[in-house]
Swiss-Prot record:
Designated gene of the protein: DYNLT4
UniProt note on tissues of expression: Ubiquitously expressed. Expressed in testis (at protein level).
Assembly mode: Interacts with ENG/endoglin, TGFBR2 and TGFBR3. Interacts with PPP1CC.
Family matches, as InterPro entries: Tctex-1-like (IPR005334), Tctex-1-like_sf (IPR038586)
Protein name per UniProt: Dynein light chain Tctex-type 4
Bias kind Basic and acidic residues: ranges: 10-21
Region annotation Disordered: where it falls in the sequence: 1-52, 65-87
Residues bearing PTM Phosphoserine: 66
Keyword Cytoplasm: yes
Length: 221
């Protein structure tokens, strides 16, 4: 009786048994062999894989090493492009050093000395003189009003600082407007100590404008 021909897969198994080697798996047509199948049997260096090639690149080509280089600062930070301020100095957002803070020695007092209290009547006279000197020939202009108000506040602050006792903080505000027959009410409110703090307010008018200046003298310890 004639033997039937074996299928291709069975024929390879029989041939592998005869030769004593491991049979190769049967793959469908159009499929490539895997890494284990393509790797040669026996000892020898393993072929370079994609993962190994990526890990084997030089460290100098990585983005992390480009940021953390020889010129990096502590903690891997890149140095600033601007000038480095001295250690312990304060710097503003513009990069310029700030003015040193004003320091006053503590007196361990919670109220002023009886002879060093803020006098509202004396401040009132100085405030009237400051407004008369700064506005006697002034004409109202919307473009120059802001500059004129700043100058008046500076003049009032200089005059009253010379008359105020130590440890008093002065808060000055000036309201300026055109004189056109309108009615204006200027009101100010403050949280203060009636026994130690004070207030002076003066209004001034000429043919073109009106002004209301208010100064609060607050005892600051």
């Amino acid at each position: 009786m004639a033997s039937r021909p074996l299928p291709p897969g069975r024929q390879e198994e029989e041939n592998a048994k005869d030769s004593g080697r491991k049979p190769s798996p049967v793959r469908p047509r159009g499929c490539l062999p895997s890494i284990d199948e393509a790797r040669p049997a026996g000892p020898g260096p393993a072929p370079a894989s994609r993962r190994g090639s990526m890990l084997g690149l030089a460290a100098s080509f990585s983005r992390r090493n480009s940021l953390v280089g020889p010129g990096a600062g502590p903690g891997g930070q890149r140095p600033s492009l601007g000038p480095v301020p001295p250690l312990g100095s304060r710097v503003s957002f513009s990069g310029l050093p700030l003015a040193p803070a004003r320091w006053v020695a503590p007196s361990y007092r919670t109220e002023p000395v009886p002879g060093e209290r803020w006098e509202a009547a004396r401040a009132q006279r100085a405030l009237e003189a400051a407004l008369a000197a700064g506005l006697h020939d002034a004409c109202y202009s919307s473009d120059e009003a802001a500059r004129l108000v700043r100058e008046l506040c500076e003049q009032v602050h200089v005059r009253l600082r010379e008359l105020s006792p130590p440890r008093y903080k002065l808060v000055c505000s000036v309201v300026l407007g055109p004189r056109a027959g309108q009615g204006v009410h200027v009101v100010s409110r403050a949280l203060w100590d009636v026994a130690r703090d004070g207030l002076a307010s003066v209004s001034y008018t000429n043919t073109s404008l009106f002004a209301v200046a208010t100064v609060h003298g607050l005892y600051c310890e």
